[in-house]
């Protein structure tokens, strides 16, 4: 889920940022460039927590830009198979539903929803139990288990299930 790791990045800085605030400018550019991004290997970078080392700059020929090797600590979010997450439902259709847990989108197929829940179409599509006591619709909060992940270069997709003990709707916006 969340990990605190050390990463490295080569930062290019324009000559106008040189001077007394060089380090501050480098750190703010690093935060702007990496926070909120996703690398397939490490996951989503949530926050930069510290700078371990800023190496000596190397002037690039012809441009005046300087490349600094920066070693920094950060918190990353990476979901794994078998992990239990709480997510918010964003879309419901007859094939299943999509939910989001932070930056990760999770699809739960109708085959991975308990058998006693049926799809109800209409202006607010949902999955409802036969007695109507539990309803999964847009903005419902669900607890689910990740059963598969696919990692791209810039995004992570997950497949989840609520067909297990203690999984399912946590908070239904219709009852609030």
Swiss-Prot record:
Gene3D superfamilies: Nucleic acid-binding proteins, RNA polymerase Rpb7-like, N-terminal domain. GO terms for cellular component: P-body; RNA polymerase II, core complex. GO terms for molecular function: single-stranded DNA binding; single-stranded RNA binding; translation initiation factor binding. It is found in: Nucleus. GO terms for biological process: nuclear-transcribed mRNA catabolic process; positive regulation of nuclear-transcribed mRNA poly(A) tail shortening; positive regulation of translational initiation; transcription initiation at RNA polymerase II promoter. Component of the RNA polymerase II (Pol II) complex consisting of 12 subunits. RPB4 and RPB7 form a subcomplex that protrudes from the 10-subunit Pol II core complex. DNA-dependent RNA polymerase catalyzes the transcription of DNA into RNA using the four ribonucleoside triphosphates as substrates. Component of RNA polymerase II which synthesizes mRNA precursors and many functional non-coding RNAs. Pol II is the central component of the basal RNA polymerase II transcription machinery. It is composed of mobile elements that move relative to each other. RPB7 is part of a subcomplex with RPB4 that binds to a pocket formed by RPB1, RPB2 and RPB6 at the base of the clamp element. Belongs to the eukaryotic RPB7/RPC8 RNA polymerase subunit family. This is DNA-directed RNA polymerase II subunit RPB7. It comes from Glycine max (Soybean).
